[in-house]
């Protein structure tokens, strides 16, 4: 039996001057057991000016949150620089390479995915999703952005994650939304 804790959905969007990130609350042990339904996977960092969300191993994600916040402090809140430096360290360090998590980080100006393989990716359309329900949330978010532009970013984030929760067994509808 797979005893790793994983599976989630994180979605982030910038729309009409607002930035929002949403995450569900489910933590799954292996493929069969829901261990927790109210986990908080989206956090405010750097004096509340940056949002970060994770998908993957919980313990690994906390390590990455700490390292990313250190990089933000080191580079005076420069999101892109902190993300690139974290990705370089993550990829270059033998111990860190073992971490199994992905991050979405954002501020009012940018959204980035940071991965352990060294990628720092900015989406073309100001929305992105990761995790087991990521493709469902991303699809819903794109449809909302195109056809329901009157919604706020926080409403889009919530509704996109709600769609993912309706489809993905590893995503629940205990949704936390943070906005900037």
UniProtKB/Swiss-Prot annotation:
Notes on how activity is controlled: Allosterically activated by HslU binding.
Alphabetical GO biological process terms: proteolysis involved in protein catabolic process
Cellular compartments per GO CC: HslUV protease complex; proteasome core complex
Residues that coordinate or bind Na(+): 165, 168, 171
GO molecular function: metal ion binding; threonine-type endopeptidase activity
Protein localization: Cytoplasm
The entry's keywords: Allosteric enzyme, Cytoplasm, Hydrolase, Metal-binding, Protease, Sodium, Threonine protease
Disulfide bonds, paired cysteine numbers: none
Predominant location category: cytoplasm
Active site annotation, chain numbering: 8
Catalytic activities: ATP-dependent cleavage of peptide bonds with broad specificity
E.C. code: 3.4.25.2
EC category: hydrolase
Task performed by this protein: Protease subunit of a proteasome-like degradation complex believed to be a general protein degrading machinery.
Family listed: Belongs to the peptidase T1B family. HslV subfamily.
Subunit structure: A double ring-shaped homohexamer of HslV is capped on each side by a ring-shaped HslU homohexamer. The assembly of the HslU/HslV complex is dependent on binding of ATP.
Protein name (record): ATP-dependent protease subunit HslV
Gene: hslV
């Amino acid at each position: 039996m797979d005893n790793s804790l994983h599976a989630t959905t994180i979605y982030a969007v910038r729309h009409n001057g607002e930035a929002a990130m949403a995450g569900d609350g489910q933590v799954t042990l292996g493929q069969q057991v829901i261990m927790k339904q109210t986990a908080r996977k989206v956090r405010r960092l750097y004096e509340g000016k940056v949002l970060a969300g994770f998908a993957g191993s919980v313990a690994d994600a906390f390590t990455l949150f700490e390292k990313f916040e250190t990089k933000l402090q080191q580079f005076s809140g420069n999101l892109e620089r902190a993300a690139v430096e974290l990705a370089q360290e993550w990829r270059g360090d033998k111990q860190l390479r073992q971490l199994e998590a992905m991050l979405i980080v954002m501020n009012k100006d940018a959204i980035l995915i940071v991965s352990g393989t060294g990628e720092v990716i900015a989406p073309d359309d100001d929305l992105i999703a990761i995790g087991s329900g990521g493709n469902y949330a991303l699809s819903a978010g794109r449809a909302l952005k195109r056809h329901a532009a009157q919604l706020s970013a926080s409403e889009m984030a919530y509704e996109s994650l709600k769609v993912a929760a309706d489809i993905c067994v590893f995503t629940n509808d205990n949704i936390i939304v943070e906005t900037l």
